[in-house]
Structure formats: C-alpha cells, structure tokens
C-alpha cells in the first residue's frame, strides 16, 4: 500500500459518514505471514506517521503522559465485498465455525482492527510532523490507522475477564534453535523480537508437516524455518527480495 494514499471507508450507510485514516504504520512486516496474532505478544518496534492533514503537533500534546495506547485500524489486506456470519479461527484448527462477532477475525462486515500497544516516545519530524514510537504492534507495514486513544488502566483492564478458545493455548511456545551464524545476520536490535515471533509459532494451526520449510519477510530479511515437535529450527536468513 502507498503510505501517502488515503482510503475512504463508508462506515454508516444511513448517515453517509466517511471515516478517513489519520495515520499509517511503519513496521518490519511486509507480509501477513509471521505477524503475531495479537498485540503485545512480541516486543516489536513500529512507528505511526500522520497524513498531512493531521500533522499538527498540537494533536499529540499530552500523549506522552500515557504508557499505552489503543490503535483503531483497518485490515487493509482483508477487505471483501461480501461477509460471512461465521468464520473458522486458526486456533480451532481451521475447521470449526464460530460467529464472526465472537472472534477477532479480519474478515468482518467492517474490517476494523483494535490493538493495545506500548508508547515508547513521540518525536517531531520537521517535514512530516509528529511520529509516535510504539512497541508490541501486530500490524502490517502501511496499515491505515483511523484513530489513536490513550489506554486507561482502571477502565480498560479486566483481569477477571474470560477469553473463550482464544486463551486455551496462550502459554504454548516453541523452543527456537537459531544458529549463531544466522542470528548474526539479523540486526542486534531486532533479534529479541524475531525470536519471540518464532516462539509463538507463525504457522497456520492446521499445518503440522515437520518436513515443510516456511518463510516470511521481516526487517528486510527473509526468514526460513521448519518445526519438529516442540522445536523450531531456523534454516536460512537471506536478504528480502522486494517484488
């Protein structure tokens, strides 16, 4: 997606309201494969850049007084003309159907995503206005951001909440075998977050072939791996070939 492109979305057919992105994400993911399935699961660094109309620094005054933010964004790679009342969550093996409003599937009537991220700083770019630096984002590079709201701990945190099937395997992690000669090809500042991503098992839940080689682009690199039982083995790290 062109980061300068502003996408209009018809949100309410009755009132005719139009919702426009105010910003977009710069992240290390140029493909959906490998992106954590929820925010906050890996210490991924990203930046929020505003479109020209919203680059007034006054709009982010006071933002640094918060530690976390809510991002409201668009599943820009999952827009469909039709919608289905049920979807098949990967966590359930890809065969069991659940109501779309009982999941966080990207295939929704309105392709809206919601992510809680950590705010690490705000800088001012003389040409492009304020840049918001975040950690823990689960967003594709170029994702349109519709709104940014502060996370309010006393209102937004619900430790007693139930999470249905989404929490059934939340503590499952793979052991990651990353040969030093391959790990050294990854910038040191990206190594920790990459290992966290791999430990989360990027594969679709229904693919368990131990001989298959998987790959995804990350931070300008192509990461290839295979999984055998509970261990992930990194096979190759090469420069990403841009299409």
What do these predicted regions represent?
Residues 117-120:
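Conserved positions in beta-strands of structured domains
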């Amino acid at each position: 997606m062109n980061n300068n492109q502003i996408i209009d979305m018809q949100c309410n057919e009755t009132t005719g309201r139009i919702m426009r992105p105010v910003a977009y994400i710069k992240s290390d993911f140029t493909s959906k494969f490998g992106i954590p399935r929820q925010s906050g699961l890996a210490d991924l660094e990203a930046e929020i850049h505003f479109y020209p109309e919203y680059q007034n620094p006054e709009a982010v005054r006071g933002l640094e007084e918060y530690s976390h933010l809510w991002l409201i964004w668009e599943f820009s790679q999952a827009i469909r003309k039709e919608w289905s009342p049920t979807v098949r969550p990967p966590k359930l093996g890809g065969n069991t159907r659940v109501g779309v409003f009982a999941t966080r599937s990207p295939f929704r009537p309105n392709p809206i995503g919601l992510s809680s991220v950590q705010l690490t700083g705000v800088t001012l770019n003389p040409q492009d206005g304020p840049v918001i630096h975040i950690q823990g984002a689960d967003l594709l590079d170029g994702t349109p951001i519709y709104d940014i709201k502060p996370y309010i701990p006393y209102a937004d945190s619900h430790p007693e909440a139930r999470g249905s099937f989404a929490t059934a395997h939340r503590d499952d992690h793979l052991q990651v075998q990353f040969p030093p000669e391959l790990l050294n090809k990854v910038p040191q500042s990206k190594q920790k977050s990459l290992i966290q991503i791999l430990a989360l098992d990027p594969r679709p839940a229904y693919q368990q072939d131990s001989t298959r080689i998987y790959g995804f682009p990350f931070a300008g690199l192509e990461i290839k791996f295979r999984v055998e039982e509970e261990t992930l083995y990194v096979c190759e790290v090469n420069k990403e070939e841009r299409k």
